[in-house]
């Protein structure tokens, strides 16, 4: 998908969200008009690729809102504190930035007009392009228009909800009065005329992002599938009448004959984006740097294609083109690296004045401030100006302690305060105005640790172990649905006192995120009991992730036994859960009556209560086959190249806790190891995607709003139904849960009939006839999230089952699952559910079986769309989201992670003449921050 934007266009983007690690190299005297900062990331680690493989720029993560998009988030208000506590916080608004308006459309229901459009083909565009203009012939009904408004967020517009729920075409009116500027902040001119922002700049931006992904260079290409982008209509080109393949057949972006100057966009001020179906997060997603514009008339932008004279080189691998990084000329790529920066352009609030091995310098874009800033919500106070310049030094591997010392020495404008230096900071900066207090309102992005999804790999037609994974470890990973594997994962999450460990890493932690969806994102029902859905009346709720009165709350139910507050291993605690399995009926058919007749199942599903204790945890390890001589190597791979002293202490304590938890009378069944990595560089694909080491590895979860988007990241499958790098087969586990719900013998017959006569109506059509469903009645997670005040397990099981049936229908209706195969599966659930549910010597027999979740592949009509429709369904109703979170989190696919808590105040240092505006996630938005020129 697209190679994009200004820094490195051809880049793989692992957006390292480090709440802006504010630090820098020592300098005896600060220039008050310059904001001095520093990054610990090694942005130039490998000069053979563009700036450590960020798609747009390595600075897009460390300099929030230095660039501009169709939409963006603006931070308004001021952070205030009383010297200890935060008294007022920044508010965040989603706004139109480079677009003046956006209109949402849905396909017209008037068949006559639609037929006219199809008959004519709409191929005659005003500029002679051979691309179809899909906006013509009134195929579309306008849903509504949102106009740029400096007083409010576009989410407050009365049309917002309807547009985002129904639109499959978005037409942005581009602000073509804005000029591109060069590295001196001057208007770029071609043919003596200023180069203005154009719809083609956005189309070219999308296009290079798609190309980058298709070449295997950008690991964030999943955004295209997630939003459901109709690539051909948005950026594709068609072959001409003279082509051997016939008129109208699309040419792939990776084809050397792809014409990058053949645009879908006909008018410079209109950019149309087409989706295959509505996606509620689309306008929010357009604030991501992947979709920012690049200047389509720039010679190096025109060169971003495959072909004889292209700087891009590729190898052919199984009929797929893969970027050849060793032979690609990155200096010939727009924004490709240090040597390519001297001729880059900008339309954002800052432009890059200079860039070398030691530092990068940003200057404020005066043209942006003249045209765009007055039309955005007001951010700065009357005595503040935009920060004129930003200088960031590169200090790879530097720790917070180094940055703190640099601030004291006068080399930095801002710095975090390490926990070990908080008392020093209080005394040293008392009354100076430097010490500020922040409070995180929500998590924008977090690094979680999950389990390897690739215990086996294929070597031609032979199944072999993945590198560094033992046969026993592969058995544990592969049979993830077994009682033993579930017990081990639940024990690691539930028998370690993660809260106690998190305290070690203060101020970078406070609460513990036990869930795939972190605090501050989930919207709970308001007090009146009505569902908030995607509306803004929900209450920010972090109830999953807190420990109150020494009891753990949320998706890990309260434990029995003593919590043992100051112990890292809770060896007297019990974590209760339900284990689900299927069994054949030994030839006897189970007949279930219904009003329309009767049908038979050849296997049944059942549940079993499991109590996870230290003893049962050890027993499960032994049952899998782990011993002192053949231990579980629990390798946690991190993206960090270095750790702070607090983090070193945290991970050492975690290693000790894992070792203690796995100790069986002096025999260590678990050997933990923390492996530092590199969040940048060409080896990252192997580091994360290759999963060439054992059990734990770090991944970045999403950094955009919506509970559904976080669920999407946890349930992603590819077109073959295989779990992607960040999922550990949670997607297939959800499908298994849906089959369990529909296979209950008092539910099966009704659903079989519904599948037989399915029509695309609403989910209630499959639920209204169900009056009893007891399979989940003892599940503590189901009771906690779907039970009544009396914790009635029967009613909770029924409510949970109805949600499962609603999602099952939604996935069938949207052609993610095949109705006939689902019918077959619930008639004989054991055929699908027993494949990886037994630990005893169960391993893949052939290469088609090596992937976790392979047993469900025949059910999918379009497996790659599972995560997308999970996220859409989750946003339709709060209880939908709660259902998916319950299913995923009770499967324990990720380890708990410490993070800045909603109730933690975090000290930081900032020179008194600056006013930083941090987004609710804690990330500084440089565009909105202020400078006080005294």
Curated annotation (Swiss-Prot):
Covalently lipidated residues, kind N-palmitoyl cysteine: 25
Subcellular location: Cell membrane
Topology term for the membrane: Lipid-anchor
Name under which the protein is recorded: Uncharacterized lipoprotein MG321
Lipidated residues (S-diacylglycerol cysteine): 25
Keywords: Cell membrane, Lipoprotein, Membrane, Palmitate, Signal
Segment forming the signal sequence: 1-24
Pfam families reported for this sequence: DUF5396
Predominant localisation class: membrane
Domain of life: Bacteria
Chain intervals for the UniProt region annotation (Disordered): 111-131
Protein source organism: Mycoplasma genitalium (strain ATCC 33530 / DSM 19775 / NCTC 10195 / G37) (Mycoplasmoides genitalium)
């Amino acid at each position: 998908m697209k190679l994009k934007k200004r820094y490195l266009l051809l880049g793989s983007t692992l957006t390292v969200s480090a709440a802006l690690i504010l630090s820098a190299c020592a300098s005896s005297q600060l220039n008050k008009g310059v904001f001095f900062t520093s990054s610990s990331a090694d942005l130039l680690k490998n000069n053979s690729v563009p700036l450590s493989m960020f798609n747009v720029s390595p600075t897009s993560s460390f300099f929030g809102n230095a660039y501009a998009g169709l939409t963006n988030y603006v931070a308004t208000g001021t952070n205030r504190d009383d010297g200890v506590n935060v008294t007022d916080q920044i508010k965040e608004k989603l706004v139109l930035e480079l677009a003046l308006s956006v209109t949402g459309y849905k396909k017209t229901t008037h068949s006559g007009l639609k037929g006219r459009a199809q008959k004519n083909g709409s191929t005659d565009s005003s500029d002679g392009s051979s691309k179809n203009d899909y906006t013509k012939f009134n195929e579309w009904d306008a849903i509504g228009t949102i106009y740029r408004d400096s007083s409010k967020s576009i989410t407050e517009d009365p049309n917002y909800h309807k547009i985002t729920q129904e639109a499959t075409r978005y037409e942005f009116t581009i602000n073509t009065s804005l000029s591109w500027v060069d590295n001196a902040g001057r208007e770029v001119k071609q043919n003596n005329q200023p180069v203005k922002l154009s719809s083609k700049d956005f189309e070219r931006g999308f296009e290079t992002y798609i190309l980058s992904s298709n070449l295997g260079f950008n690991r964030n290409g999943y955004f295209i599938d997630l939003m459901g982008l109709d690539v051909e209509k948005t950026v594709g080109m068609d072959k001409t009448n003279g082509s051997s393949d016939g008129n109208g057949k699309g040419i792939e972006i990776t084809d050397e004959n792809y014409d990058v100057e053949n645009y879908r966009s006909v008018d410079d001020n209109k950019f149309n984006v087409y989706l295959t179906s509505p996606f509620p997060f689309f306008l929010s997603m357009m604030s991501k740097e992947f979709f920012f514009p690049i200047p389509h008339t720039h010679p190096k932008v025109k060169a971003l294609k495959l072909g004889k004279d292209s700087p891009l080189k590729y190898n052919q691998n199984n009929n797929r083109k893969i970027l050849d990084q060793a032979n690609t000329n990155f200096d010939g790529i727009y924004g490709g690296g240090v040597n390519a920066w001297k001729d880059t352009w900008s339309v954002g609030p800052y432009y890059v004045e200079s860039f070398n091995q030691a530092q990068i310098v940003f200057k404020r874009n005066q043209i942006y401030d003249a045209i765009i800033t007055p039309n955005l919500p007001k951010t700065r106070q009357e005595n503040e100006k935009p920060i004129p310049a930003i200088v960031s030094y590169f200090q790879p591997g530097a720790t917070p302690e180094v940055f703190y010392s640099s601030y004291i020495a006068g080399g930095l404008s801002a710095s975090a305060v390490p926990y070990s230096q908080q008392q020093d900071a209080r005394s040293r900066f008392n009354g100076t105005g430097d010490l500020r207090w922040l409070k995180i309102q929500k998590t924008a992005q977090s690094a979680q640790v999950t389990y390897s999804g690739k215990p086996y790999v294929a070597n031609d037609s032979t199944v072999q172990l993945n590198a560094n994974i033992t046969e026993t470890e592969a058995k544990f990973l592969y049979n993830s649905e077994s009682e033993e594997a579930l017990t081990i994962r639940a024990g690691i999450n539930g028998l370690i006192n993660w809260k106690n460990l998190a305290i070690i890493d203060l101020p970078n932690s406070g609460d513990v995120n036990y869930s795939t969806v972190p605090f501050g994102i989930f919207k709970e029902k308001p007090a009146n009991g009505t569902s908030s859905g995607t509306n803004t009346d929900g209450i920010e709720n972090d109830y999953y992730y807190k420990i109150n009165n020494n009891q753990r709350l949320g998706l890990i139910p309260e434990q029995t036994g003593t919590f043992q507050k100051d112990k890292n291993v809770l060896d007297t605690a019990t974590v209760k859960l339900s284990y689900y399995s299927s069994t054949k009926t030994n030839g006897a058919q189970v007949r279930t009556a219904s009003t329309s007749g009767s049908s038979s199942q050849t296997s049944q599903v059942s549940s079993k209560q499991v109590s996870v204790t230290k003893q049962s945890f050890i027993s499960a390890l032994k049952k899998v086959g782990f011993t002192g001589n053949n231990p579980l190597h629990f390798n946690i791979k991190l993206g960090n190249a270095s750790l702070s002293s607090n983090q070193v202490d945290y991970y050492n304590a975690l290693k000790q806790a894992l070792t203690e938890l796995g100790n069986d009378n002096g025999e260590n069944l678990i050997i933990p190891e923390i492996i530092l990595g590199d969040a940048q560089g060409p080896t990252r694909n192997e580091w994360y995607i290759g999963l060439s080491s054992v059990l734990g590895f770090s991944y970045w979860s999403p950094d955009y709003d919506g509970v559904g988007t976080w669920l999407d990241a946890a349930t992603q499958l590819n077109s073959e139904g295989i779990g992607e790098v960040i999922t550990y087969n949670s997607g297939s586990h959800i499908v298994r849960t849906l089959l369990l719900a529909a296979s209950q013998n008092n539910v099966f017959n009704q659903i079989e009939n519904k599948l037989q006569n399915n029509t695309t109506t609403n989910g209630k059509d499959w639920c209204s006839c169900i009056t009893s469903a007891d399979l989940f009645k003892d599940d503590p997670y189901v009771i906690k999230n779907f039970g009544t005040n009396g914790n009635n397990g029967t009613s909770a099981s029924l409510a949970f089952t109805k949600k499962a049936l609603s999602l099952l229908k939604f996935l069938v209706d949207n052609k993610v699952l095949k109705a006939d195969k689902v019918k077959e599966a619930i008639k004989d659930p054991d055929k699908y559910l027993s494949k990886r549910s037994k630990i005893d010597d169960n391993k893949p027999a052939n290469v088609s079986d090596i992937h976790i979740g392979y047993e469900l592949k025949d059910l999918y009509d379009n497996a790659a769309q599972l995560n997308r429709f999970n996220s859409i369904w989750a946003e339709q109703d709060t209880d939908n989201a709660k259902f998916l979170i319950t299913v995923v989190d009770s499967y324990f696919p990720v380890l708990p992670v410490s993070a800045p808590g909603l109730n933690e105040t975090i000290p930081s240092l900032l020179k008194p003449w600056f006013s930083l505006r941090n987004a609710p996630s804690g990330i500084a938005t440089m565009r909105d921050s202020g400078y006080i020129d005294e």
